[in-house]
Every structure is written in structure tokens, then in C-alpha cells.
């Protein structure tokens, strides 16, 4: 391909996408030579497809004294291209051991994502040399096939609650030299970020010091490295397919919380090379950041090989891993207040309203209460009974659940009902006057069960 063909190449790429009338093509636009070329190609394509919507987004990081001028450059160029442009200003949160590159990239995506819907396409101007940088960085970090697969030309991009859209890199198989030649031929004006010359940043070091020497020795190394990345991506796809078949067999719903947990005995029974892969798959399926290889090995050692009564509590990135009753629980580590909460109102006529309000104290979920005439259920309060809600009862508190003939201390019932220690302070208890009548999700006190076909209140999850 010659530089003259580059705009045709961009148009063909865009034509291959699942575009529909009203879809929006959004370009992450920095004003650098790569995104300038892609912005030009997008403007040419817009003449062919006026039924689509277009948007350029420049993210102002505030890191350079030239950033305001760059924003003005992008606005001026967008006017020449006849494309709408948005300037998004972000503020980076920096500190010790925080990567400026990583934080800037994170901030860019956070600024751009609100502009996207599932039918839209995000375009980024990564090229073949960027791909080589990504592969070399993955090697430096000791990553496996997933990391070495680097960037795909088409990848899904999560939009959180809105679903996902596609992220497309039309220039990923185009060399930096070809992009620069095209820009010169079309006399495209672009900015030069002075920070690109600072080799304290890993990508700049590779771009300035390493890749030129590699290409001088092996001119096609960026192309062949991209081929290796594609092969790694294919291998990773096979692994992920296998994980999608194996992992569900290791998962169950936990008592009380009904969250998905991993059966550690089943994980330990897997071939050793699959244990780490499946654990990573479980963490990823719960939408937490993935651990490093070293962290993963340490986690496996503690989760599988520690003594059965050992307390396992591991914090990795944004995830807390806990072992209880042979199960692996994952959560964000953000717990509710463990202080005693009591609400009391004389509203026997409004008990369902009370309990719905109280549900705000139970993991911010709507508590699944129901009025039923069968099964274990709580009789409704009498006219002279005050309903109250409590948390954090002492372990010596004596209870008699509907499924027991005799009373038992709460600390024993926690174990019997398989309630993890870190969740016990968050289980709500319902009282009529000063008498315990229900433990949410666990039991109804035997003396307060509805009788015969009498209507009663049910909120039971665990089945001891």
C-alpha cells in the first residue's frame, strides 16, 4: 500500500463496520499526526455517508502549558474538516508510584465514554508501531497470550450500564512512516507534544531508543510482531472458550448473599496449569482487575493449600478475596457500617412499607419480602406490637429458628447457616416489641410462625 491509498484504506475499514443510519463515529482526537490523518479520512468518509453522525473529542489533560493551544488547534482543524468537535477537560489524580501514562489513558476513556451509545463506534488512531510498543511492554511485564495479543483492530468496549460498543483501530496495520508521508502529501497540520521526547516514560523510551534500532536491523519487525500478536489472540480465544465451559461447573450461589462463589475443592481438582487460568477467569467474570502472575500464584497457595481453619483475606487491586466454608468470595471490600441500627415505628398497618425502607440497610437492595400462605413465614404484627429492625446482635443471643426443635446461640447458627463472618453484622433482625421474630434471609422464630393457612411474611434465602 502506498501513502496515497491511505484514505481509501480508511474508507474501506469504515465500510466494513456494522453501521446503521444514526450511528455515530467518534474519534479520540489529540491533534497528533496519527489522529490528524484519521480525522482527515473521517471527513472524506462523511461526504460519502451523510446519514451517519460524526464527532471528534479532544481530551485536555492539563499536563502541558500548551494544552490550551492544542485544544484551539483541534477546534480549528475540525472546522476545516466540517466535523463537530468537543473539548473535554479532565484532572488527573497523581501520586507516588502512579503512572502518568496509565492515569492519562484512564481519564481519556472516562471522558469519551459518556458520548457513546451501543450503536456507535469509537475510532482510535493506533498504528503498527504502537502495536509493537504494546507487545514489547507486555514482554517486559511477563504477560501471557492475553497481554501479548496487544490491541485488536476491532474490540468490544464496555459502556457500563448502557452495554457495549465497538472500538476500531483502522490504522493498526499501517506504519508510522506511511502515516507521516500521507500527512506531508496532504499538507495536514498537526501538533507535536513535547512530552513525547521525554524518555522517562516507557513508551517514549521504546519509541525513541529501541524501536528505531530494531527496525534498522529488521525493517519488517513491526509487521511480524503484529502477526505474533494475532496468533496470541487466536490462542487466547481458544483458552477463553474452554474457560467458559469449565468455569460454570465450579460456581455456585452462596447462602444468604446469593452471590456467585467458587468451589475451592473443585478448583484444586483441576490440572495445576488450569487452576490459575480458571481463577483469573472467575475474577474477570466478576468484573475485577486481574492480578499479576506472581499475585495469582500467591493467591492459589493461600486459597488451596492453607490450613482449612486458616483465615484467608487477600486484597488485590480493587478486589478482596475471602475463603469461607470451602468457597471463594470476591467483593470490593466496601462494607456497610457494623454499628447497631434500630428503627422502630408503630405502624402495623404499614409493615411492607417499613421493610422496604429498611431494605436500604441491606446492601442497598430491595429485600424480597412476600406475603404467602404456605411455607415458613412470619405472622403479621398485632395492633399493639411495635415493629423494629436491628443489626449486630451479640453471638450469645439465643434464637430458635423454625427449622430447630431447640434454641441455640446466634454464633452457632451463623455457622449452621453458612453466613460468612464479614457479613454477619449486616444481617437484619426483625422484632415485635422486644422479641426477635425473624432473621432476614435465614429464619423465622418458631414461636412467631404463621399457622395453618394464615397469611404471613416470608423472606427466606438460606435453606439449612
UniProtKB/Swiss-Prot annotation:
Listed GO biological process terms: tRNA modification
Top EC category: ligase
Entry's EC annotation: 6.3.4.19
Record flagged with keyword ATP-binding: yes
Matches recorded under CDD domains: TilS_N
Keywords from the named record: ATP-binding, Cytoplasm, Ligase, Nucleotide-binding, tRNA processing
Gene3D superfamilies to which the protein is assigned, alphabetical: 1.20.59.20, HUPs
Family of this protein: Belongs to the tRNA(Ile)-lysidine synthase family.
NCBIfam families: lysidine_TilS_C, lysidine_TilS_N
Annotated function: Ligates lysine onto the cytidine present at position 34 of the AUA codon-specific tRNA(Ile) that contains the anticodon CAU, in an ATP-dependent manner. Cytidine is converted to lysidine, thus changing the amino acid specificity of the tRNA from methionine to isoleucine.
Protein name: tRNA(Ile)-lysidine synthase
Species: Shewanella oneidensis (strain ATCC 700550 / JCM 31522 / CIP 106686 / LMG 19005 / NCIMB 14063 / MR-1)
Gene that specifies this protein: tilS
Amino acid at each position: 500500500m502506498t501513502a496515497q491509498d491511505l484514505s481509501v484504506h480508511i474508507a474501506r475499514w469504515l465500510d466494513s463496520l456494522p453501521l446503521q443510519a444514526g450511528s455515530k463515529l467518534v474519534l479520540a482526537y489529540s491533534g497528533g499526526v496519527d489522529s490528524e490523518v484519521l480525522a482527515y479520512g473521517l471527513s472524506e468518509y462523511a461526504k460519502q455517508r451523510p446519514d451517519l453522525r460524526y464527532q471528534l473529542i479532544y481530551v485536555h489533560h492539563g499536563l502541558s502549558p500548551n494544552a490550551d493551544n492544542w485544544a484551539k488547534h483541534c477546534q480549528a482543524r475540525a472546522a476545516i474538516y466540517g466535523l463537530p468537535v468537543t473539548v473535554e477537560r479532565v484532572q488527573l489524580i497523581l501520586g507516588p508510584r502512579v503512572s502518568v501514562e496509565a492515569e492519562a489513558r484512564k481519564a481519556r476513556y472516562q471522558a469519551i465514554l459518556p458520548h457513546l451509545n451501543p450503536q456507535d463506534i469509537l475510532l482510535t488512531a493506533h498504528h503498527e508501531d504502537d502495536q509493537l510498543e504494546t507487545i514489547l511492554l507486555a514482554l517486559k511485564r511477563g504477560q501471557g497470550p492475553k497481554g501479548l495479543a496487544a490491541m485488536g483492530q476491532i474490540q468490544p468496549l464496555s459502556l457500563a450500564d448502557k452495554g457495549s460498543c465497538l472500538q476500531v483501530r483502522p490504522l493498526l496495520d499501517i506504519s508510522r512512516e506511511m502515516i507521516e508521508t500521507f500527512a506531508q502529501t496532504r499538507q495536514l497540520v498537526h501538533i507535536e507534544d513535547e512530552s513525547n521526547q521525554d524518555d522517562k516514560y516507557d513508551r517514549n523510551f521504546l519509541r525513541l531508543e529501541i524501536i528505531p534500532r530494531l527496525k534498522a536491523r529488521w525493517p519488517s519487525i513491526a509487521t511480524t510482531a503484529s502477526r505474533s500478536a494475532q496468533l496470541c489472540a487466536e490462542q487466547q480465544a481458544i483458552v477463553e472458550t474452554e474457560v467458559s465451559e469449565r468455569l460454570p461447573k465450579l460456581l455456585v450461589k452462596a447462602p444468604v448473599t446469593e452471590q456467585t462463589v467458587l468451589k475451592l475443592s473443585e478448583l484444586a481438582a483441576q490440572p495445576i496449569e488450569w487452576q490459575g487460568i480458571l481463577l483469573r477467569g472467575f475474577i474477570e467474570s466478576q468484573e475485577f482487575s486481574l492480578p499479576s502472575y506472581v499475585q495469582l500464584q500467591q493467591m492459589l497457595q493461600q486459597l488451596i493449600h492453607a490450613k482449612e481453619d486458616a483465615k484467608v483475606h487477600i486484597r488485590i487491586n480493587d478486589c478482596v478475596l475471602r475463603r469461607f466454608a470451602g468457597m471463594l468470595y470476591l467483593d470490593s471490600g466496601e462494607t456497610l457500617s457494623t454499628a447497631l441500627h434500630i428503627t422502630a415505628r408503630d405502624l402495623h398497618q404499614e409493615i411492607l412499607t417499613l421493610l422496604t425502607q429498611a431494605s436500604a440497610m441491606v446492601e442497598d437492595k430491595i429485600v424480597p419480602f412476600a406475603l404467602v400462605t404456605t411455607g415458613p413465614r412470619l405472622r403479621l404484627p398485632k395492633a399493639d406490637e411495635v415493629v423494629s429492625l436491628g443489626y449486630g446482635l451479640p453471638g450469645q443471643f439465643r434464637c430458635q429458628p423454625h427449622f430447630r426443635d431447640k434454641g441455640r446461640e446466634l454464633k452457632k447458627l451463623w455457622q449452621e447457616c453458612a453466613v460468612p463472618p464479614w457479613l454477619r453484622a449486616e444481617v437484619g433482625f426483625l422484632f415485635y416489641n422486644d422479641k426477635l421474630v425473624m432473621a432476614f434471609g435465614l429464619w423465622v422464630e418458631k414461636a412467631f410462625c404463621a399457622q395453618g393457612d394464615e397469611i404471613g411474611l416470608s423472606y427466606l434465602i438460606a435453606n439449612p
